């Protein structure tokens, strides 16, 4: 069974790379080793290295787990949709809501 590869835009790759750099800097500022963070996050060292490189094939749960270990920074993920710049970029996109059929 082959996994489907999701196409990632170059801008997204750049953002993920920057996020990875910030995660690595946060780990180094806290003087935490790769082993400590990976173990606390419940991921392998290889996955942590991929997170720090901004690899787009890493599950978002791994990013969230690492951010949680680095002083609960994962709560920042909740505020992304409130960011004005982010909101202005998605303003034109129609969000699909599930419409339920009436039982009447």
Please tell me what each predicted stretch does:
Residues 33, 59-62:
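Residues that mark the N-terminal boundary/hinge immediately upstream of a DNA-recognition element
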Residues 61-79:
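DNA major-groove recognition helix of helix-turn-helix/homeodomain DNA-binding modules
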Residues 2-29:
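A short, Lys/Arg-rich alpha-helix, primarily the initiator
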Residues 77-104:
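Short, charged recognition helix plus adjacent turn
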Residues 31-49:
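Short alpha-helical DNA-recognition segment
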Residues 21-37, 97-104:
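Short basic helix-loop element that most often maps to the first helix and adjoining turn
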């Amino acid at each position: 069974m082959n996994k489907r590869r999701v196409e990632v835009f170059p801008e997204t790759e750049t953002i993920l790379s920057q996020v990875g750099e910030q995660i690595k800097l946060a780990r180094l500022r806290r003087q935490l080793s790769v082993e400590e963070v990976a173990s606390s996050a419940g991921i392998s060292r290889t996955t942590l290295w991929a997170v720090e490189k901004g690899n787009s094939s890493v599950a978002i749960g791994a990013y969230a787990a690492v951010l949680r270990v680095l002083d609960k920074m994962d709560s920042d993920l909740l505020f992304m949709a409130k960011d004005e710049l982010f909101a202005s970029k998605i303003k034109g996109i129609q969000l699909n809501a599930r419409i339920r059929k009436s039982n009447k």
